[in-house]
Regions:
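HIT superfamily nucleotide-processing domains
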Residues: 1-201
Length: 201
């Protein structure tokens, strides 16, 4: 199977995606750490982009995966998320997000954005619903505080005094999620290792 034509994309392409697909990998500028922090601080998540060749591979893989499993949700439930979770709607052990470790799963993102070397994109899936604003699709103030508390506990504190400067996180708005059936669940952030090494968490 060759490249997927834009008009046959297996998920809605944003204007940024279409622009990226018009580029070569050599023309593409990866997101650096400072730019990434600015994007997340201003909540302009729509500008996050994959490398052109990665986006083409992601489109192809998504089409093949949907053909094999019927949906991305089925693939994730079969291969990436804990079997005890079952099928959505899930029945979490706690109604408080991230309170019970069996209610979330931390994974390296299989299809990260185009990031500078040393930055790793990690996704946190939660079977406990994290409330969003029905009008904007963004997190509520309380949800943002809940996620921040988890990020601090799970990622920042493990890095000691330098942790706060080395971790950023975000949650895609509903409109930007490629797996809508599990749309309430993915959480992502970023971590920078000591020295010049950086990671996205």
């Amino acid at each position: 199977m060759g490249d997927i034509p834009v008009e046959e994309a297996p998920f809605p392409l944003t204007d940024v995606d279409k622009w990226v697909l018009s580029q070569t990998d050599e023309e593409f500028k990866k997101h650096g750490w400072e730019e990434l922090k600015e994007i997340i601080a201003t909540n302009k998540l729509e500008v996050l982009k994959r490398k052109p060749s990665d986006l083409r591979r992601y489109m192809k893989w998504t089409a093949e995966t949907k053909a094999e499993y019927g949906s991305m949700t089925k693939f994730l439930l079969t291969n990436r998320l804990p079997k005890p979770w079952g099928e959505p709607p899930f029945s979490p052990k706690s109604t408080v997000p991230f309170e019970d470790p069996s209610d979330y799963r931390v994974l390296v993102n299989d299809w990260p954005y185009g990031l500078d070397p040393g930055i790793t994109h990690i996704v946190v899936w939660s079977r406990t619903i994290i409330p969003t604003d029905p009008e904007t699709g963004d997190m509520t103030v309380e949800s943002r505080r809940t996620v921040q508390d988890f990020i601090d506990r799970y990622f920042v504190k493990t890095l000691g005094d330098v942790g706060e400067d080395r971790v950023v996180w975000f949650k895609n708005w509903v409109a930007l999620q490629s797996v809508r059936a599990l749309g309430a669940y993915p959480r992502a952030g970023a971590r920078r290792r000591p020295g010049s090494h950086q990671e996205v968490v």
